[in-house]
Amino acid sequence: MAGMRRLELAEALHLGPGWRHACHAMLYAPDPGLLFGRIPLRYAVLMQMRFDGRLGFPGGFVDLRDGSLEDGLNRELGEELGEAAAAFRVERADYRSSHAGSRPRVVAHFYTKLLTLEQLTAVEMGAPRARDHGLEVLGLVRVPLYTLRDRVGGLPAFLENTFIGNAREQLLEAVQNLGLLEPGSFAHLKISTPP
């Protein structure tokens, strides 16, 4: 991922006191819905519009002295998503990757959490009442995991937005590795695919 090097979690946790840790989670759920009665949605994936106008995943900086990365991430999710985040807990088993950047010295830890569609919808409904809504978080968005007939609308157009850090690459890697897209979808996207 551009400007960042991938590292194992154990290595990331031993980098020392000069490093800050940020944890973010992609929340997703199977979605049997059809757009316009014919385009399968397959999955609902949440991202958020941040205070800086960029798209990213819920989460933020955590302090390892307060417990685990997951404790800090779940605290952040509660602040950004509200009470519905208490219905689930991101665990170590949900961990996907860590990437380190040298300036600033930040390690970005990424998690994916499978929810039910009801849980995900509750998060969407409750988010406007969350502590950080309207401040750090300007709103939640669902990622369109389809490509329209023109091969521009849907995911290709969504990926033209501005993302924070490596959130775009995290999204692409996760949806590919978790099998959230129709088989062969990446071949039709005019983007560079994750390694």
From Swiss-Prot:
PROSITE patterns referenced in this protein's UniProt entry, alphabetically: NUDIX
Binding annotation for Mn(2+) 1: G59, E80
Residue ranges constituting the Nudix hydrolase domain according to the UniProt record: 18-168
Top-level taxonomic group: Eukaryota
Binding residues for Mn(2+) 4: H99, E173
EC number(s) on file: 3.6.1.62, 3.6.1.64
GO molecular function: 5'-(N(7)-methylguanosine 5'-triphospho)-[mRNA] hydrolase activity; cobalt ion binding; dIDP phosphatase activity; dITP diphosphatase activity; IDP phosphatase activity; magnesium ion binding; manganese ion binding; metalloexopeptidase activity
Compartment(s) where it occurs, according to its Swiss-Prot or TrEMBL record: Nucleus; Nucleus, Nucleolus; Nucleus, Nucleoplasm; Cytoplasm
The keyword DNA-binding appears for this protein: no
Sites where the protein binds Mn(2+) 3: E76, E80
Keywords of the record: Cytoplasm, Hydrolase, Magnesium, Manganese, Metal-binding, Nucleotide metabolism, Nucleotide-binding, Nucleus, RNA-binding
Keyword set includes Magnesium: yes
Textual note on the cofactor: Binds 3 or 4 divalent metal cations. Acts specifically on U8 snoRNA with magnesium as cofactor. Has broad substrate specificity with bound manganese or cobalt (in vitro).
GO cellular component: cytoplasm; nucleolus; nucleoplasm; nucleus
Function in brief: RNA-binding and decapping enzyme that catalyzes the cleavage of the cap structure of snoRNAs and mRNAs in a metal-dependent manner. Part of the U8 snoRNP complex that is required for the accumulation of mature 5.8S and 28S rRNA. Has diphosphatase activity and removes m7G and/or m227G caps from U8 snoRNA and leaves a 5'monophosphate on the RNA. Also catalyzes the cleavage of the cap structure on mRNAs. Does not hydrolyze cap analog structures like 7-methylguanosine nucleoside triphosphate (m7GpppG). Also hydrolysis m7G- and m227G U3-capped RNAs but with less efficiencies.
PANTHER family from the UniProt entry: NUDIX T16 FAMILY MEMBER, U8 SNORNA-DECAPPING ENZYME
Family: Belongs to the Nudix hydrolase family. NUDT16 subfamily.
Subunit and interaction comment: Homodimer.
Record protein name field: U8 snoRNA-decapping enzyme
Native organism: Ovis aries (Sheep)
Organism placement in taxonomy: Eukaryota, Metazoa, Chordata, Craniata, Vertebrata
Gene: NUDT16
